[in-house]
Every structure is written in C-alpha cells, then in structure tokens.
Amino acid sequence: MAKQKKPVKPFLTDVKTLRDRARKHIAGGGVTFTYKGDVKKAIDILQAVLATEIVCVLRYTMHAVAAQGISSEGVKAEFAQHAKEEQGHMNEVAERINQLGGVPDFNPTTLTSRAASEYGTAGNLVEMIKENLIAERIAVDHYRELIRYFGDKDPGTRTMLEGILVVEEEHANDMHDLLVAHQGHPML
C-alpha cells in the first residue's frame, strides 16, 4: 500500500491573503507587511545618503564653474556631467525616502554635518580632481557598507544603492584617470 504524502504547503502567499493584507494595511503606502527592515532607521540612513549626494552636486558644480587653465575645459565638462549624475542620485534617494514614508531633508544648514563626504574648496585643477576622487572613494566604501546592511531586509533600497554604487565607482575611475593625465603618473 502506497504511503500518503502530506500536502506540500506552498511557499508563496495565496492571492486572497495578499489582497486582504493590502487592503488592511493600505495606510502603509509602499511599506508592505513583508518589509523586514526598520523603516525609521532606513529613513535616517537615507537622509545621510541624500545629504552626501547634495554635497557632491554642489562640489562638482562649484568645481565645474571654478576650474581654470588651458587644460581645464575637458575637466570642467567632466565635473558638470558628474554633478548632473549626482543630482539624479539625489532625486532617487529623495524619492525612496518618500516611498518609505519619510520627508527628504534638504535643509542646507545641516547638510555638511549629515554628509559622508566634504564640500571642499576651489583650489587648482589637480586639487579639485583629488577632492572629487577622495569624495567618490568615501561614497563607494560607504554605499558598499549600506548595501550589506540593507541586504534582504530592504531589497528596494539595496537595489537603488547598488545602481548608485556602479556610477560612483565610474566617477572614481574618471577622477583617477584625470589625475593621472594631469600629474603624469598613477596614484597607486
């Protein structure tokens, strides 16, 4: 006689349960029942990321305007392009804060105290490139840590940060290449 198997419980939630949960917790917006992270902590972390991106936009913009010299035109264009891309990151992060139920903090008086990177100064061209390279390296390390932190608890935020990280790594490489071009040797 064949042994009867117990019915296998599916790992997916049935559609009726999903619908009922969505209706019951409608006030949660994009933060659903299955969100495993600490929403308040996620928002606080993202506020610091937002501040970092704003400071980067401001620094790159200032450098794009302030860069001078016979060989500055290409560098100015690179700074301006990076400022535009950082502004895109800023908008992504602000939108994610909003999705999690927070209000993005654009308060200019607290930006530098909340940001991982520094604003910098308008020195000579090589100094500007170095400041941006340092800021990008800080962002890369910081975002890698945050990606590990969010992991499976908040895949939406993790995925957003992974996309931003790829661009920040490209920015760091661009700044390194500019530094090599203007100093004549790699900084290894």
Predicted regions, residues:
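Iron-associated oxidoreductase/ferritin-like identity signal
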Residues: 1-188
